[in-house]
Amino acid sequence: MEQTKTIFLLTFLTVIFVFFGYSFGGTNGMLIAFLIACGMNFYAYYYSDQQVLKHYNAIPLDDTKHPVYRITQKLTQKANLPMPKVYLIPDHTPNAFATGRNHEYAAVAVTIGLYEMLNEEELEGVIAHELSHIKHYDILIGTIAAVFAGAIAMIANMMQFSGMIGNNRQNSNPIVMIIMAILLPIAASIIQMTVSRSREYMADEGAARLTGNPAGLQSALGKLENYARSGHQINNATEQTAHMFIINPFSGLKSTLGALFRTHPTTADRIARLEELKSELRK
């Protein structure tokens, strides 16, 4: 199922690029766009995780005695997973994400703010949540979706510019390109929403079962949501990568359109589902 989603995303990216190439440069533009899309697909599959980590200035954590490393190692062994690479993000806004392409090539990144704010039980809940994403192969889809959304934003900007000068180009259709420039960002949001919402519920449940302590994750989610709603955002946060985090970095921004295309379930709903899981785990 996850492989099918990956193929769909990469294929859709290729189609978008080819369409843009044809609209802008006819047959020659289409061929050039196809080659560019193939290169981007290769890059997205093998290197998109490193691009995201680099974007957030993530630093490899090799200190085996550090609480984040120690907890990750303990939970990884319990989940019967290979040890992922562990990164610290030098930012005091509490948040975390997982990235990579499979169990063998995976990484967990947490901000310094997360480590400073949460107690050990809460930290276990967050890290278990990210390991659940790794276990269920959500990480490849999420990371590719981030690169894909960024590419769509770039294409939309190019189309807006092309639409302005399109009357001077024989093969361009400025009206079509302007329409696409409007629709493409919406398509990116829908893809991010589809990728993320249901997977967050599954990762929450997986974390609760792995730790045996839903309360730890509940408490962590509440703290992270309250902090996000205070208006603080992680440095370099982008809408294209927002779906990767355990809490959307932009959840503090009030927007009707933003609520419609929300990448995460509401934190209240997530906490309520974890509450329901408590009684099941007590049995």
UniProtKB/Swiss-Prot annotation:
Keywords attached to this Swiss-Prot or TrEMBL record, sorted alphabetically, are:
Cell inner membrane, Cell membrane, Hydrolase, Membrane, Metal-binding, Metalloprotease, Protease, Transmembrane, Transmembrane helix, Zinc
GO MF, any single term: zinc ion binding
- In terms of one coarse class, where is the protein primarily found? membrane
Query: Could you name the active-site residues?
Result: E130
Q: Is Hydrolase a UniProt keyword of this protein?
A: yes
**A cellular component term (GO) from this record?**
plasma membrane
| EC number(s) reported in the record | 3.4.24.-
How is it placed in the membrane, per its record?
Multi-pass membrane protein
Record-given protein name: Protease HtpX homolog
| Provenance organism | Aliarcobacter butzleri (strain RM4018)
